[in-house]
Amino acid sequence: MAPLLGRRPFPLVKPLSEAATGEGEEEVYMIEHSKEAFRSREEYESRLERYAERIWTCKSTGSSQLTHKEAWDEEQEVAELLKEEFPVWYEKQVLEMVHHNTISLDKLVDQSWMEIMTKYADGEECDFEVGPEKYLRAKIVKVHPLEKEEQASEKKSEGSCDSPSSDKENSNKVAQDIQLKEESNRLESLSSLRESDRARRSPRKLPTSLKKEEKKWVPPKFLPHKYDVKLLNEDKVISFVPVDSLYRSERPPNKEILRYFIRHNALRIGTGENAPWVVEDELVKKYTLPSKFSDFLLDPHKYMTLNPSSATKRKSLGSPDQKPAKKSKKSPLSPSSWSLANLKKTAVNSSSSEEEMQLMIGANLNKKGSIGKKSDKKKPKNGKSQVLNGQKISAKTRSPKKGLKSPKLKQMTLLDMAKSTPKVSRAQKGGSNTPRSSSKPNKYLPPAALHLISYYRDNKNREDRKSALSALISKVARMLSAEDRKRLPDDLQELVQKRYELLEHRKQWAVMTEEQREEYMRKKREALKARIKEKTRERKQKEREERLEKQKRYEDQDLTGKSLPTFKLVDTPEGLPNALFGDVAMVIEFLSGYSDLLLPDGQYPVTAVSLMEALAAEKGGFMYLNRGLVVLLQTLLQDEIAEDYGELGMKLSEIPLTLHSASELVRLCLRKSDSPAGENESIEKGDEDSEGSAVYQDDEVEDEYLEKLETSEFFELTTEEKLHILAALCHRILMTYSVQDHVDAKQQRSGELWKERLAILKGENDKKRAAKQKRKEQGTVKPKEEVQAAKIVKKQEKINTQQDNDAEDMISAVKSRRLQAMQAKKEKEEHEKLTKERIERETEEERSRKQKASAEKAFHEGIAKAKLVLRRSPLGTDRNHNRYWLFSDEVPGLYIEKGWVHDSINYRFSPESKQDSEQDAEESEDANSSIGCPDDSTQREEKHAETTVPKQGQNLWFLCDTQKELDELLDSLHPQGFRESQLKERLQNRYQDIMHSIHLARKQNLGLKTCDGQQELLNFLRSDIIEVATRLQKGGLGYLDDTTEFEAKVRTFENLKDFGECIVFLQAAVIKKFLQGFMAPKQKKRKHQSEEAAAKAEEQDEEKKMAEEAKVASAVEKWKVAIRDAQTFSRMHVLLGMLDACIKWDMSSENARCKVCRKKGEDDKLILCDECNKAFHLFCLRPVLFNIPDGEWLCPACQPATARRSSRGRNYAEDSTQDEDEEEEEEESEEEEEEESDEEEEEQEMMGQRLRSRKAAKGKPGRPTRRGRPPKNNTHSRVSRQRYVEDTEADVEEMVRQSKPTSRRQNQEFQKCEEILAKLIKYRFSWPFREPFNADEIEDYTKVVTTPMDFQTMQSKCSCGSYQTVQEFLNDLKLVFGNTELYYEAGSSQLSCLEKTEQCARDLLGKHLPAHTYQRRHRKHQSPEPEPETANPGRGRKQKK
């Protein structure tokens, strides 16, 4: 085994024997891979040069243009593969077929593979079935031949092949029979596939084509041979075992392995099409392979001298006029030698009878169409037959004269006519076609040319006949003259003419000198360049024309192409028409696109399938539909456009929003104008606020739908009505300021991400440029470093030599050890330094990689979210103007919309003016967005190509939910259609997104949660009423002592009127002072005036008081009437929510917190003031109360001032004037009224019954006096009183401090102040302000700073409750920072900490106390005592950051 040189084996040099190599001391040269040994260096080098050339061919794989070593290694790899993959017992079976076979390699592989698959080999190990599911290991000992009938059929086919006059037709017939036999075996094997045939997988990777065949194709059926098998475990032989009882345990080799085996162990001798395969001699001897041909490899000239008659006979068969040729010497090689057949056996038995030979020859002549030609009937003299290129020729047909004798005529039978008629007609047709292209039809072409014509016609498309056809063309090109070449058929004439020119060129080349050859090659190269240039120009021109042609667009309906695939309708539940799927998709897309705004908590998304089921279900869809309504109403009611939405004098945003009140709130939001309560509000607010609710003509709901909602629940409406209301609600939300802000925020975020991305890219480019510049600089410095390194190395070598010379000296030894230790230490330090740098570099790279990945992820997410909030546009339209949609994951699949045009859409395809286009864009709901659309110029050019308009019709939706349908759609879209070209491009660009959506469409829907909507509303109404009653009773806000009977009574109610009476009863049971809103009694606190002034005021305000009471009574009466007239449970829920919102729940004892210690707990020791409802612990009061007093109890702040003065024996009114007292009393009353209004608003905002907090109103019209002038500070009154009474200063301060009650909002603000102070103390830059200054350490501090303050002191004041207002806390905070700025000089560390800490304080105050502003004047050496700063009342709405 060795690589081939070209197609021939190359002998290797034998390795020298050991004795020969041991005798002489001559140097031996050996090649490593082939182990060839040479004594001569010249031979060795010449052989190496030869082996290094790429002229070698691997014998096992056929790979050419390899070096000798590559081919050798490839052969070794194939040998190892065959050891693993090719069992030993198949070797003899395959090699017997290969040896001396003349067919091509592909056919040889197919035949040997079929032989292995249909027959067990001798020596093969298999499983022998001895019982049901019981097998024994056995070995094939003998293969019995088939039965007689099958043998006879085989002999018959072989005999026809062995005929000496067999021709192309016979060989084709044999090949067809074999092919039919293989196909029949394969078809039979499909039904008899055995389950027990276990496949042994190959360790090597097979081609993908074989893998695909294994999946689709079944191995052929075994032939019905019988076998003798020997059991491996026992020494027994069982004879005549049928093939059905044997099972192959190991998979036989595939065709690729067979191909490797045949190439590896056999070689094809010659290059002809019928060249034989010869197995290696070792394997021939090992398996005693029989030789099929005795004289197969004879020289052709010698063979022709022995068999001249064969050529004569073949020439006579090929003549067009069906006449025998006169002379055979004109053609030493017969044309029949080129029409060879693939035969299994070519040797003829010498004992064959004359009759058999005569019959076979006669049959072959009849098939050829030559009736009058028959070979001689006499037996050959020598009894042998000769072979030319694998074809049998009788030895008796030498004499041409005997072959020209006319045989006896016979009567033709019908069978003979049937066989000969098609062949004769074909021969006549071929003969008549030949002279058509000739200028002289009466003159015939030479026989070789005629044979070439027929051979070319039959074999021009066959790969295995190309070499024979090429040789025949060369022969005819040499033989024919120019005139004869012109008479050939056109296609053949061109081939012969080119071959003739090639042969003439070779002759001229042979007689040329070197100069002539160079000149000729130069001209030829120039001509070739010019031709290539011309061809390139023509090719570019053609490509340009093709490209321009492809860019042209035509009307889709004018083009002819594949028909579009038929899609199925979208599967909708019963009761939901297919035409409404578009509205369902619109609602789902809105919820999905604005999920960050509508569903900020990442709630479970609303899907199209579930929404359709909920719409189709009646009572079962209550939970799912109302959840969608709640999601939409949460955003709508908190927006500024819903500030004027009201009912019965209350804003809709203040009513609790639940699943049970959503239906009624939807009706109230979608009204064209608000109820009369809106008019009442407008009367209260004035002309400025009397606009009422906004009217939306574009997105309003029909009145009949809203009238139905008054008498029925939302889930009880029809499917179309529910969907129409959902769509209108989505359109209403699209007009809100929240949506506008959300879209702006997403677009702004997208722009910021683009800027960040560009900055990152710029930074990377800068780094690359810097690294490149650094490499250039290092490249210039490197040679100098190398010179220095070389000098150091030389010095080190000198030192080493000196050390070697003085090695005997002890001092030099010690020095060398020290030097070595120092050098080792230096190397270790250098190594550690390099390791540290490498670790730092790797860490930095990993950090930058993670940062880059996170930035890339954030960028793509931001861009995707920015696209989500824009209008969804279709992917495109097809030839029939059907639109194709790809929605979000909640609406999975590719959807096709048909009949989308209606009367309100003005579809145009001609150029139009700018104004018309803008008007159409406003009118059309389905106008395409600007994103993803082509340029205007291309649109104007392409608009001319569209000449059809979509037709109005029924709106239907279809679904493409399989990859096969999508591929068919892409294949059927025309690439030059105006609409379909764009659609195809977008579908291809988004192919992966569409496949992801199709995959999601296959997931099974979980279904809806079963519920009864009417029962749910009933149960929750009962529980809400009971909850309100219980809270009233526990909080002490009503006149309810025991609610047990009330609860039992409510649980039995089912009628709305009964529930209404319960709610009215609850309203009446609430203590009046704990009501607010439109139910609160309009009473003003009386001012402390003189008796005359009080009488006048009472007379003047009596009419106003009566009007206000009538007004309140009328509002409550309207509410009661609405309760009695309510027809739906959701309406009753809304009215109950109004009552809930009008109760001051923060006044409940459940939420009470001690005013002194501000702590809850110990309810048994907690007492409430009957005037201000503030809570106090008994042990927190001064003096302490040991028991809860009977009757009404007033806190110290609410007790009459005169009573307290008289009880303590103090008099403060003598020295004060009456005007000052009136001014102070008026100021206190105004502040109390303001606080009460603030408390009402705070209570409405802090309601715990809502799903989400409501947005506060922008302006508070009830506080004009507060905005008109700033409130007076309590310090003023305290100072004024100090001027008159100095000895009672402490009592006055305490009385004034307690005269102003602390509201719930202030309690919360004080808690926020404590949190802010705690965070400031923990802030790392606040160390200069945490503790008070030590006067001993810093002596001059008290001289500069008159009023010291620090965080620790502020914290103690907060814990003691010393701060009465947030402004006092802010003043102390400003004092801390002002003292630091006053004492320390510029540039000190304390001032730098001041800036950072003050900025931190500003951020915390803006976050936790946005209603209070922090402003401090930066002045040095000013009076540190702060003045109270009033909040700017006109600052308006806070801007967003």
Swiss-Prot record:
Catalytic activity: L-tyrosyl-[protein] + ATP = O-phospho-L-tyrosyl-[protein] + ADP + H(+)
Listed Basic and acidic residues bias regions: 147-171, 776-785, 824-858, 937-946
Subunit and interaction comment: Interacts with smarca5/snf2h; the interaction is direct and forms the WICH complex. Component of the B-WICH complex.
EC numbers for this chain: 2.7.10.2
Residue ranges, compositional bias (Polar residues): 386-397, 430-441, 1299-1308
Tissue expression pattern: Highly expressed in the neural tube.
Domain notes: The bromo domain mediates the specific interaction with acetylated histones.
Enzyme class, first EC level, given as a word: transferase
Keywords on record: ATP-binding, Bromodomain, Coiled coil, DNA damage, Kinase, Metal-binding, Nucleotide-binding, Nucleus, Transcription, Transcription regulation, Transferase, Tyrosine-protein kinase, Zinc, Zinc-finger
Compartment annotation: Nucleus
Region (Disordered): 147-212, 307-338, 364-445, 531-555, 675-696, 766-785, 823-858, 911-949, 1204-1308, 1408-1441
Zinc fingers (PHD-type), renumbered ranges: 1151-1201
SMART domains membership: BROMO, DDT, PHD
Entry-linked CDD domains: Bromo_WSTF_like (cd05505), PHD_BAZ1B (cd15628)
Role noted for this protein: Atypical tyrosine-protein kinase that plays a central role in chromatin remodeling and acts as a transcription regulator. Involved in DNA damage response by phosphorylating 'Tyr-142' of histone H2AX (H2AXY142ph). H2AXY142ph plays a central role in DNA repair and acts as a mark that distinguishes between apoptotic and repair responses to genotoxic stress. Essential component of the WICH complex, a chromatin remodeling complex that mobilizes nucleosomes and reconfigures irregular chromatin to a regular nucleosomal array structure.
Requisite cofactors: Mn(2+)
Residue intervals of the WAC domain: 26-132
An annotated GO BP: DNA damage response
Protein name per its UniProtKB record: Tyrosine-protein kinase BAZ1B
Organism: Xenopus laevis (African clawed frog)
Taxonomic classification: Eukaryota, Metazoa, Chordata, Craniata, Vertebrata
